[in-house]
Curated annotation (Swiss-Prot):
GO terms for molecular function: ADP binding; ATP binding. ATP binds at G190, M191, G192, G193, I194, G195, K196, T197. It comes from the Eukaryota. It comes from Arabidopsis thaliana. Potential disease resistance protein. Signal peptide: none annotated. The LRR repeats probably act as specificity determinant of pathogen recognition. This is Probable disease resistance RPP8-like protein 2. Pfam families: LRR_14, NB-ARC, Rx_N, WH_DRP. Belongs to the disease resistance NB-LRR family. RPP8/HRT subfamily. One of its GO terms (biological process) is defense response to other organism.
Length: 906
């Protein structure tokens, strides 16, 4: 539906003109003329979209409109930015600046007239083809934010309620993995959308499976995988604390993984393996010795038998009509108000038949219709399905058009802003886990969402849009069970195909995978019309210097190889809003000074990049909203004192290491919502006083000021939700300092203290809603548990690296009433831990790591009946012997579904 996409751009342009009307004073006639033509154009778009399939000329006109809107936006913003820069050049250049000002205004007026003329020509052309004006329907519709407030009252992201007909299949697969010693490989094969990954995930997390195996790994094998990456991810899952894995070459990885799999019982899941050749590329690490087991999912039915002739090959059945209806009804009814009209069962069942028994299609259709509140709306969807889908049931891999159409319907039903949010997911590679915080910053940087007008944060606004896509079953999400906030999202590969197809159809994105020439394009898309460029290979970095990209608005890079890039500069990308250079290794460690020419930039990331020198021209980027300077930790980074110019910043991550003489003035960054790696050595703590919008703050305390002064500088930060203190010089904090630390932060939920804190504050000094606390290297002499267990809202506690130096720790009856996760790591002096009956009644996960003097698990652990997962890491072999079936302490853990021993002494 191109009309919605084009209309969104037109509306954004109208907003820009209205918002900046005061600064455009003096050229009112040209601006008013442009706005009039935009209004006329808007009224033609709906009819043009309805007739776009009748003639290519209409489609071309719609593409012209998108180009015009982008060009107009670029022209207006460039003028406003250049005018602002002119005002800042000082008195000495006043006369020259005035002359330039007049010239710029005349040129801008001429450019606006040119845009208006182009719109007029499009309008005339459309009308010559019979395109008619259609007035807006009138009546106020709820904004997306208002609709989200309603949705959040009833919408649950719990996918368990969407599972139908899997119980028997899950039990069968579990039996073969756990009980059948003659089977080493189990495969689940079938067409896309039939539920292979869902089934595998249920098996992977099954209580019996978690209990049986010593370790687990889940790796998605995309069509563009590398052998090294797959081996690396498996080994990282099985040895999570081995930091050396990232540096291993293929030969070392192969040897380490082969030896590890020979030594224990491990379950490996390779999800979405496409070809037999893919298996052949990675199979060298899997020993013939029994013990480890493999669960494969693939569309290729013969893959499992190719991997292992004794493989148990399982093919999920499509849902029966009854199961399809049950799943559909469950989704629709769980997301609707009970007072709404009764679902027309006959009409609903007919629509469900077009899903061909595929769970994905049923869930997407259910998510679509759950939002339709009237019989008329249901009839419209029904009519759309009947009109466009031929054939009612029975699908094969060669005949999935009807399923594709069902998935497309959900896209077509999206509001126009959500279409852009959905399109943006096309940037990411297949099976990619998308960090939603980064995704939200992309959306904001491109103006797709605008969180700032009502005081909401980027995170809150982004979540409301993403939840709409989740509710429609267009994306799947991974959320923290501790915070219930979404952390990652992904698309099913069939939905991704829809997303890519629609995004390319609208010229929204150009994807470059492995180019062979500097002019490589995909699907013959015009580089001038695709304003977003995504590189899925580091070998394509040279394309950033290509002249065809001069109108690009975003550049994202994935799959960066370990080699240096020598950029020619960024002159060919003058209109960029988003530039993500994460993991890119710059030759010589220098970011080119031409980065300062990208004056439209809103998002810049150098996360884990090989950069050690930043140019002073960075200060030209006055529109930046997100700046991530979290380069590779090993690098000492020269940062010029120009960040103070970026007064629109909402997110700032500073490098961990900077030269001793570096001083940064940050006091004017009053819009910051998140500030990471703020060092008292390189910045003044008084700069924090005015950052009252901060919700996330990470401070590195290095002794240049007193801790009391630091705390006083934080007193106005009433919106803080996450606060971290890191004292790497181990300066002991006075007792009253610890009390002041948390006294006033009434909204604080997450607290990290990595510092000497010999005396712990009492529970009355902690904020009322504190949910998560990390204590690292605090060297407390008294047991902190009597205080921590009285914090009624605590959900997670992490004690690490000498947080407590005592020998005995006690968790009392009634303590920690809401605690879900407890981790104790590197408590080298702890000998005895006692848990009383009635303590930690809700605990779900417990990790004991490298507490070598701890004699045994507490007897009271047998009373913690909610415990689902126990991890014993880097402990003595005696622990394993005592806790396995038949062991001396087995009775303490026999109720826990998953007990894992990781890197324990052999």
């Amino acid at each position: 539906m191109a009309e919605a996409v084009v209309s969104f751009g037109v509306e954004k342009l109208w907003e820009l003109l209205s918002r900046e009307s005061a600064r455009l004073n003096g050229i009112d006639e040209q601006v008013d003329g442009l706005k009039r033509q935009l209004g006329r154009l808007q009224s033609l778009l709906k009819d043009a979209d309805a007739k776009k399939n009748e003639t290519e000329r209409v489609r071309n006109f719609l593409e012209d409109v998108k180009d015009i809107v982008y060009d107009a936006d670029d022209i207006i913003e460039s003028f406003l930015l250049n005018e602002l820069r002119g005002k800042e050049k000082g008195i000495k250049k006043q006369v020259r600046t005035l002359a330039c000002f007049l010239v710029d205004r005349r040129k801008f007026a001429s450019d606006i007239e040119g845009i208006t003329k182009r719109i007029s020509e499009v309008i005339v052309g459309m009308q010559s083809l019979g395109i008619q004006h259609i007035a807006d329907g009138g009546g106020r519709s709820l904004s997306l934010q208002e609709r989200q407030r309603e949705i959040r009252q009833t919408f649950s992201r719990n996918s368990e309620s969407d599972l139908v007909g899997l119980d028997q299949s899950v039990e069968e697969l579990v039996d073969h993995l756990v009980e059948n010693d003659s089977v080493q490989v189990v495969s689940v094969s079938g067409m896309g959308g039939i539920g292979k990954t869902t089934l595998a995930r249920q098996v992977f997390h099954h209580d019996i499976v978690r209990r049986h195996f010593d370790g687990f790994s889940w790796v998605c094998v995309s069509q563009q995988f590398t052998r090294k990456d797959v081996w690396q991810r498996i080994l990282q899952d099985l040895r999570p604390y081995d930091e050396g894995i990232i540096q291993m070459d293929e030969y070392t990885l192969q040897g380490e993984l082969f030896e590890l799999l020979e030594s224990g019982r491990y379950l490996l899941v390779l999800d979405d393996v496409w070809k037999e050749e893919d298996w052949d590329r990675i199979k060298a690490v899997f020993p013939h010795k029994r013990g480890w087991k493999m669960l494969l999912t693939s569309r290729n039915e013969g893959l499992g038998l190719h991997a292992d002739p004794t493989c148990f090959a399982f093919r999920p059945r499509i849902l029966t009509p009854e199961q399809s209806w049950k799943l559909f009804e469950r989704i629709v009814s769980s997301r609707r108000d009970k007072t709404e009209f009764k679902v027309d069962e006959a009409m609903g069942k007919e629509m469900v038949t077009y899903c061909g028994g595929l769970p994905l299609a049923v869930k997407v259709l259910g998510g679509l219709l759950a939002k339709k509140h009237t019989v008329l709306e249901w009839k419209r969807v029904h009519s759309n399905i009947v009109t466009h889908i031929v054939g009612k049931s029975g699908l094969s891999d060669d005949n999935s058009n009807s399923v594709y159409r069902v998935l497309s319907l959900s896209y077509e039903d999206l509001p126009m802003q959500l279409k852009h949010c959905f399109f943006y997911l096309a940037h990411f590679p297949e099976d990619y886990k998308i960090d939603v915080k980064i995704l939200f910053n992309y959306w904001v940087a491109e103006g797709i969402i605008t969180p700032f007008h009502d005081g909401s944060t980027i995170q809150d606004t982004g979540e409301s849009y993403l939840e709409e896509l989740v509710r429609r079953n267009m994306v799947v999400v991974e959320e923290s069970y501790l915070t219930s906030r979404i952390e990652y999202c992904q698309m099913h590969d069939m939905m991704r195909e829809v997303c890519l197809s629609k995004a390319k159809e609208e010229n929204f994105i150009r994807v470059v995978k492995v180019p062979t020439t500097t002019s490589t394009t995909i699907n013959a898309q015009s580089p001038c019309r695709s304003r977003r460029l995504v590189l899925h290979s580091g070998n394509a970095l040279h394309m950033l210097g290509h002249k065809d990209n001069k109108k690009a608005r975003s550049v994202l890079i994935f799959g960066v190889e370990e080699k240096f890039w020598k950029p020619r500069g960024f002159q060919c990308l003058p209109l960029l809003r988003v530039l993500d250079l994460s993991y890119v290794q710059f030759e010589g460690g220098k970011l080119p000074s031409s980065i300062g020419d990208l004056i439209h930039l809103r998002f810049l990331s150098l996360y884990e990049a090989g950069v050690s020198h930043l140019p002073s021209s960075l200060g030209n980027l006055k529109l930046l909203l997100c700046l991530n300077l979290g380069v590779a930790d090993r690098l000492l980074v020269h940062v010029p004192n120009v960040l103070k110019e970026m007064q629109e910043l909402r997110y700032l991550r500073l490098p961990r290491s900077m030269p001793a003489k570096t001083k940064l003035e940050l006091g004017d960054l009053v819009n910051l919502e998140s500030l990471t790696n703020f060092s008292t050595k390189h910045g003044s703590v008084t700069d924090l006083l005015r950052m009252t919008k901060l919700s996330v703050l990470n401070v590195i305390f290095s002794g240049e000021c007193t801790f009391e002064t630091l705390l006083l500088s934080l007193r106005e930060l009433r919106n803080l939700e996450t606060l971290s203190f890191h004292d790497f010089q181990k300066v002991s904090v006075a007792n009253h300092g610890g009390e002041l630390l948390v006294l006033d932060f009434i909204h604080l939920k997450d607290l990290t203290l990595s510092m000497h804190l010999p005396r712990f504050p009492d529970q009355y000094r902690f904020p009322p809603h504190l949910a998560h606390i990390w204590l690292i290297g605090c060297r407390m002499e008294e047991d902190p548990m009597p205080i921590l267990e009285k914090l009624l809202h605590l959900k997670s506690v992490y004690l690490s690296s000498g947080a407590f130096l005592g020998r005995r720790m006690v968790c009392s009856k009634g303590g920690f009433p809401q605690l879900l996760a407890l981790k104790m790591s590197y408590k080298k002096e702890l000998v005895e831990w006692r848990v009383e009956e009635g303590s930690m009644p809700c605990l779900r996960t417990l990790t004991i790591d490298n507490c070598k003097k701890l004699k045994q698990l507490p007897d009271g652990l047998k009373y913690v009946t909610c415990l689902k997962e126990l991890k014993i890491e880097r402990m003595k072999r005696e622990w394993t012997e005592r806790l396995v079936i038949g062991g001396e302490d087995y009775y303490k853990v026999q109720h826990i579904p998953s007990v894992q021993f990781i890197n324990c002494d052999h």
